[in-house]
UniProtKB/Swiss-Prot annotation:
<feature type="binding site">
    <location>
        <position position="9"/>
    </location>
    <ligand>
        <name>Fe cation</name>
    </ligand>
</feature>
<keyword id="KW-0291">Formylation</keyword>
<dbReference type="GO" id="GO:0005506">
    <property type="term" value="F:iron ion binding"/>
</dbReference>
<dbReference type="Pfam" id="PF00301">
    <property type="entry name" value="Rubredoxin"/>
</dbReference>
<keyword id="KW-0479">Metal-binding</keyword>
<comment type="similarity">
    <text>Belongs to the rubredoxin family.</text>
</comment>
<feature type="domain" description="Rubredoxin-like">
    <location>
        <begin position="1"/>
        <end position="54"/>
    </location>
</feature>
<keyword id="KW-0249">Electron transport</keyword>
<keyword id="KW-0813">Transport</keyword>
<dbReference type="InterPro" id="IPR024922">
    <property type="entry name" value="Rubredoxin"/>
</dbReference>
<feature type="modified residue" description="N-formylmethionine">
    <location>
        <position position="1"/>
    </location>
</feature>
<dbReference type="InterPro" id="IPR024935">
    <property type="entry name" value="Rubredoxin_dom"/>
</dbReference>
<dbReference type="GO" id="GO:0009055">
    <property type="term" value="F:electron transfer activity"/>
</dbReference>
<feature type="binding site">
    <location>
        <position position="39"/>
    </location>
    <ligand>
        <name>Fe cation</name>
    </ligand>
</feature>
<dbReference type="InterPro" id="IPR018527">
    <property type="entry name" value="Rubredoxin_Fe_BS"/>
</dbReference>
<protein>
    <recommendedName>
        <fullName>Rubredoxin</fullName>
    </recommendedName>
</protein>
<feature type="binding site">
    <location>
        <position position="42"/>
    </location>
    <ligand>
        <name>Fe cation</name>
    </ligand>
</feature>
Length: 54
């Protein structure tokens, strides 16, 4: 699974960790996160994230 970064604040969503504080379980691929999920640091939507090139 690929990591995604917030283009506004630099937060990196790692699917291995998920975002359990906001209802996203570890192992959840970015495409499977609910559309109303927002960046836990700055509050922007999923449309402000882009795939991390590794």
């Amino acid at each position: 699974m690929k990591k995604y970064t917030c283009t506004v604040c630099g937060y990196i969503y790692n699917p291995e960790d998920g975002d359990p504080d906001n209802g996203v379980n570890p192992g959840t691929d970015f495409k499977d996160i609910p559309d109303d999920w927002v960046c836990p640091l700055c509050g922007v939507g999923k449309d402000q994230f882009e795939e991390v090139e590794e």
